[in-house]
């Protein structure tokens, strides 16, 4: 998947508002939104996997690879993904984001040349406060400037662990979603990780490289569009973005 969220806009406002929405989030409904902040920043690491073969061609094309029907899956073109995020450090005005965890599950669809993706469910760890959720949503609108056909939010308990040779994350103990990656044993030219450098990650201006780690499993078990894949694309990446990296919005035209 070309990140989770290739152009992730067409409309930053739509994505930001959706990610900060309260669908299925009773606790967020009564929360006051943090004031708009001119200064914000996020440095986050993602455990990411999708249904595409290794390495996901969505980073170089306007559509995902074709999939023959197998293991109970229908054929066609799609990129079904799970992205598990952990914020290393960040803020949105006075709202601190260090340590916040959240998850994205969905499908980019078969053609995203216009910046329109199929569907996504964003799940926040229960420890993330309403103010943090709203702040994350606004920042992620710049990270992934796209429009979604369907956008929902949820809440769950998230585990996130990155080691030397493996990385894994679970939602609700794996009942809702799970991802497990492993470092390839035969692809490296020598000791160390296999890393793709100088490749842009969505709307972010800086990243540490795509650390390639095929998945052992990437699955989403909730809702009406569950999926599960094994042995397909996976990687870890750390991105960095600040408010200074995003150009100011164009002024509204006088009517």
Model regions: which residues?
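Beta-strand-enriched cores of mature, soluble protein domains
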Residues: 37-255
């Amino acid at each position: 998947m070309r990140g989770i969220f290739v152009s992730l806009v067409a409309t930053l406002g739509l994505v930001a508002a959706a990610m900060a929405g309260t669908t299925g989030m009773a606790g967020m409904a009564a929360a006051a939104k943090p004031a708009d902040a001119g200064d914000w920043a996020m440095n986050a690491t993602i455990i990411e996997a999708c249904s595409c073969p290794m390495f996901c061609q969505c980073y170089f094309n306007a559509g995902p690879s074709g999939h023959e029907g197998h293991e109970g899956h229908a054929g066609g073109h799609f990129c079904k993904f799970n992205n598990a995020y952990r914020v290393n450090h960040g803020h949105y005005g006075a709202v601190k984001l260090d340590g916040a965890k959240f998850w994205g599950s969905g499908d980019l669809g078969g053609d995203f040349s216009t910046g329109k993706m199929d569907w996504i469910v964003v799940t926040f760890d229960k420890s993330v406060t309403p103010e943090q959720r709203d702040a994350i949503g606004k920042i992620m609108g710049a990270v992934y400037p796209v429009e979604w056909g369907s956008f929902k939010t949820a809440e769950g308990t998230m585990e996130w662990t990155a080691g030397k040779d493996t990385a894994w994350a679970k939602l609700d103990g794996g009942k809702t979603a799970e991802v497990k990656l492993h470092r390839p044993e035969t692809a490296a030219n020598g000791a160390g990780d296999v890393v793709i450098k100088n490749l842009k990650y969505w709307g972010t201006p800086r990243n540490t490289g795509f650390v390639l780690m095929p998945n052992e499993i990437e699955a989403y078990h909730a809702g009406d569009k569950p999926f599960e894949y094994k042995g397909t694309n996976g990687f870890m990446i750390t991105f960095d973005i600040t408010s200074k990296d995003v150009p100011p919005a164009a002024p509204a035209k006088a009517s």
